[in-house]
Amino acid sequence: MTATAVPVPGGRLHVVDEGDPNHPPVVLLHAGIANLRAWDVLVPPLVDAGYRVVRYDARGFGASTTDDVDFSNRADLIAVLDALGIGRAVLVGNSRGGQIAFDAAIEFPDRVVAIVGVGAGIGGFEGEPTPEEVALFDEMEALEEADPPDPDAIADIDVRVWVDGPGQPETRVPAAIRDKVRKMDAPQYAPGHVGGRPVPLAPPAAARLADLRCPVLAVAGGLDVSDVAQAARHLEAQAPDARAVIVPDVAHMIGMEIPDQLAALIVEFIAPLPRWS
C-alpha cells in the first residue's frame, strides 16, 4: 500500500494506491457521509482479483484539505489519475462518488473505461421520495442549517437514513459499521471545517446520460431511499450501455455491508473488458 498527497489548485488530496501497479486500475469514490476508509473491506477482494485499486478522500473529507475556493471534483479525479500515471480507469462510485464518476465520464470520456455506480447519485436527477422519506430529509436539512450545527446529531440521522435504511431497525447493520460511518461523517459539520465550493457539471448529467460512452453497472440497495433505485432504473433506460441491479436487504453503504458480494458484481462486470491502464 502506498499513501501519497496529490496537490490540486487550492488543496491536497490524500490518495491510497494498492495492488500491483501493472494491473488494470480501479478507482473508488466515496459517499458524502464517508471518506476513503469506507472502502477498507472492498479493497482486498478487488486486489486479489487482479486489480490495482486507488481510493482517495475528496476535498473536505478525511485527510484531504482545501482552501475556501471553487473547484471541480471531476478535475480533482483527473489530477489523481495523472499523478499516478493512469491513463484510463474503471470508476466505482458510492452515492456522491457515483455522481462524480458520471460527471467525469461525460467531461473526460477518454479517461473512463467503465462505471459501477453503488447507490449512486446522478446530478440533476429528481426522484419521487415517499412521504416518510420527505419527513426524514426535512429533519436532516433542519439539523444541517442549525446555527451552530450539531455534528453528532447530524451523523446520527445520517446513519439512520443511509446506513440502517429508512424505517429499518438500528440492529439491522453491525454496530461497527454504524460507528465507523458516524466517525467519518461528523467531522464535516465541526466548527471551522472548510469544504470548498464544488462547481457542478453544466448542464447536469441527468440531461446528458445519452452522452455516456462507457458501460455502466448501477447497483442499488433494496432498503435504500426509494429515489436511488429510481435513479438506477433511469440510468438503465437513458444511457447507451447500462444495466441496473437491485440488491435486496441492503441499504446505501453496500460496499460496507456486503463487500464480497459487491466485489463479485464488479469483477463480473469489468473482467470481460479489454485490458486498460
Regions found by a protein language model. Give the residues of each.
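Flexible "cap/lid" loop of the alpha/beta hydrolase fold
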Residues: 102, 106-107, 113-147
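Short beta-strand immediately N-terminal to the catalytic nucleophile in serine-hydrolase-like folds
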Residues: 91-93, 118
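Conserved alpha/beta-hydrolase catalytic His-Asp/Glu region
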Residues: 147-203, 208
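Conserved serine/cysteine hydrolase catalytic core
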Residues: 182-237, 246
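Conserved acidic catalytic loop of the alpha/beta-hydrolase fold
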Residues: 74-89
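Conserved HGGG/HGGXW glycine-rich cap/lid loop of the alpha/beta-hydrolase fold
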Residues: 9-65, 80
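Gly/Ala-rich beta-loop-alpha elbow adjacent to hydrolase catalytic centers
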Residues: 93, 97, 101
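Catalytic active-site module of serine/aspartate enzymes centered on a nucleophile-bearing elbow/loop
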Residues: 240-277
